[in-house]
Regions:
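Transmembrane helices of ABC transporter permease
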Residues: 13, 17-27, 60, 65, ...
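Juxtamembrane loop-to-helix connectors within ABC transporter transmembrane domains
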Residues: 2, 11, 80-84, 88, ...
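Membrane-integrated ABC transporters
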Residues: 1-32, 47-59, 76-80, 84-87, ...
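ABC-type nucleotide-binding domain
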Residues: 321-322, 328-585
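Conserved catalytic Walker-motif region of ABC-type ATPase nucleotide-binding domains
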Residues: 99, 221, 309, 337-339
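An intracellular "coupling" helix at the cytosolic face of ABC transporter transmembrane type-1 domains
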Residues: 13, 104-105, 121-130, 134, ...
């Protein structure tokens, strides 16, 4: 119930609407309780005495009661339904914003489909228990308590027969509710698996097709759906048995009530109108009893989903700004790694006692075999992760003491795999700087050698690039990414040079753009191009998480160490035509 209380706290900003809606709900429920009393008078006075004036008066009174109930219920429904949609929308936004506070490690450890399932399926599951469940609880409680008070006053013996129903319903709800909660959580978890497979197949569509794995993926998805169906079928079986069982108990009680009440009418202890009114009140009371049982099962299903959602909200980012973090001043570009260590898993360090320094404005190239730790080192500098030991300083300031956003605003990154949003070219470049003018965007595109091909596109800068930029070539996507970095104008540039095969023209254009981008700023590059290594003031050679060599290209070649070996064994491979080397990372 702790999670449900947390859900109800989401209603606090809208308490005025909730209070007004509750008042109208109480009024609607109260008018409903008055109707059987008028029905009793209709039978005992009008039907027996055949009084036409009383008939008209009672008919008008009942009509007015129904009209009042209609108006009050309509206002209540509007206020509560609008509030529910607003609260759920706010909750989705809250979840989305929380995801953006999470560190990279959170997404590395979890599959995309699981996160998406929580944001969609789980939120939908809790939607009806946020306002609808409390409203139903209030409405049915008024009907139940009000009805019991009235029938006790009318006939306590008949009341006792009606109330026998309560323990049986409570027992049913408790037994079946627990099972439904477990199954609901199980279903959500299994749906997350199928959502993950679906997301992977959409994003990796070309890979699936090229390897002709349609049947394999279809089988994976079918098995995941079938698995969730099995759990859903169990829930359906329980629900299918639960509903009719409640109806059977209620019908049996009504049958006994009719039998005993009929005897009371025959013996003259109660009037026919009182029996009819009593049966109507018994129906009103039985409704809440059955409703409470159904509400309990709905609550258990919602709690299963809310558990997964609050698990997400309660997860704290492994990398976050300290409470007293300082705002990063304008960065000059000095970088220091001081005995820095890092591990993804305990007892398995991937960065081992790395120490080096970079002067402002220097270009440093990182080279080494695959798995050497180059990408991890870059992530530590970007502060996607924090070192497990040692320290990283920028301009002499420890990164752990810096407010994250103030640091990230001054860091630019061009990743090896260019990520574009499925929007226009203009939006993708402008993403680097809020309020960038058209002139600034065009200037950045020109500096990245992208303006010419953009102007050849059907809608030029307004051209939609498709999901992840699929409508553009690899070289065009890279130039858009470079333009974005140029527009940001970062103090420190982090560049993971792409290894994808490009035509000679694209290669030359990209190289020119990168050289412009790296001018007059500190640049840390995972290098794959010979020109980048030759232009670097310092080359750091990494192997097994440590820096094993450093110096210029000529100095490292003279040492005849790992760098020399990589070069001569063609793991660093000179491309005579495209002025390119490749390092497998």
């Amino acid at each position: 119930m702790k999670n449900y209380k947390r859900l109800l706290l989401l209603l606090l900003p809208y308490k005025k609407k909730i209070i007004v809606g509750t008042v109208f709900l109480i009024a609607a429920s109260a008018t409903n309780l008055a109707v059987p009393l008028y029905i009793r008078n209709l039978v005992d006075i009008v039907m027996v005495e055949k009084n036409l004036d009383h008939l008209n008066n009672i008919a008008i009174a009942i009509s007015l009661l129904f009209l009042i109930q209609l108006i009050c219920q309509t206002i209540h429904n509007y206020l509560f339904d609008v509030t529910e949609k607003r609260v759920i929308s706010d909750f989705r936004i809250k979840l989305f914003n929380h995801l953006h506070k999470m560190s990279v490690s959170y997404f590395v450890k979890r599959r995309t489909g699981d996160v998406m399932s929580r944001m969609t399926n789980d939120v939908t599951t809790i939607e009806n228990i946020v306002t609808d469940l409390p409203a139903t609880m209030i409405q049915q409680s008024i009907r139940l308590l009000g009805g019991i008070i009235i029938i006790i006053y009318m006939n306590w013996k008949l009341t006792f027969m009606v109330l026998i129903l309560a323990p049986a319903l409570a027992l049913f709800a408790r037994v079946f509710g627990r099972k439904l909660k477990i199954l609901s959580t199980e279903i959500q978890d299994k749906l997350a698996v199928s959502t993950t497979i679906l997301e992977e197949n959409i994003s990796c569509y070309q890979v699936v097709k090229s390897f002709v794995r349609d049947q394999l993926e279809s089988r994976r998805f079918s098995e995941a759906i079938e698995d969730s169906f099995i759990s859903a079928r169990k829930r359906v079986i329980i629900s299918a048995f639960f509903g009719p069982s409640i109806g059977f108990i209620a019908f049996s009680t009504s049958l006994v009530l009719l039998w005993y009440g009929g005897r009371e009418v025959i013996t003259g202890h109660i009037s026919p109108g009182e029996l009819i009114a009593f049966i109507l009140y018994a129906t009103i009371i039985a409704g809440p009893m059955g409703s409470f049982a159904r509400m309990y099962t709905r609550l258990q299903e919602g709690l299963g989903a809310s558990k997964r959602l609050f698990e997400l909200l309660d997860t704290e980012s492994e990398v976050r700004s300290l409470p007293n973090a300082q705002i990063m001043p304008k960065i000059s570009g000095g970088i220091e790694f001081d005995n820095t260590c890092f591990h993804y898993q305990e007892n398995r360090e991937v960065i081992k006692h790395v120490s080096f320094s970079v002067k402002p404005g220097q270009t440093v190239a990182l080279v080494g075999p695959s798995g050497a730790g180059k990408t991890t080192l870059i992530r530590l500098l970007h502060r996607f992760y924090d070192p497990t030991r040692g320290e990283i300083r920028v301009d002499g300031i420890p990164l752990k003491n810096v407010e994250l956003s103030s640091y990230w605003k001054q860091i630019g990154i061009v990743p090896q795999e260019t990520i574009l949003f499925g929007d226009s070219i203009e939006m993708n470049i402008k993403y680097a700087k809020d309020g960038a003018t058209d002139e600034e965007i065009i200037a950045a595109a020109k500096a990245a050698n992208a303006h010419s091909f953009i102007m050849e596109c059907p809608e030029q800068y307004k051209t939609i690039v498709g999901e992840k930029g699929i409508r553009l070539s690899a070289g065009q996507r890279q130039r858009i990414a470079i333009a974005r970095a140029i527009l940001k104008n970062p103090s420190i540039l982090i560049l993971d040079e792409a290894t994808s095969a490009l035509d000679n023209e694209s290669e030359v254009l990209i190289q020119e753009a990168l050289e412009r981008l790296m001018q007059n700023r500190t640049s840390i590059v995972i290098a794959h191009r010979l020109s980048t290594i030759h232009n670097a003031e310092k080359i750091l050679v990494m192997d097994d998480g440590a820096i094993v060599e450093f110096g210029s290209h000529s100095e490292l070649m003279k040492q005849k160490g790992l760098y020399h070996r990589l070069y001569t064994l063609k793991n660093l491979e000179l491309g005579a035509k495209n002025n390119k080397i490749e390092i497998h990372t």
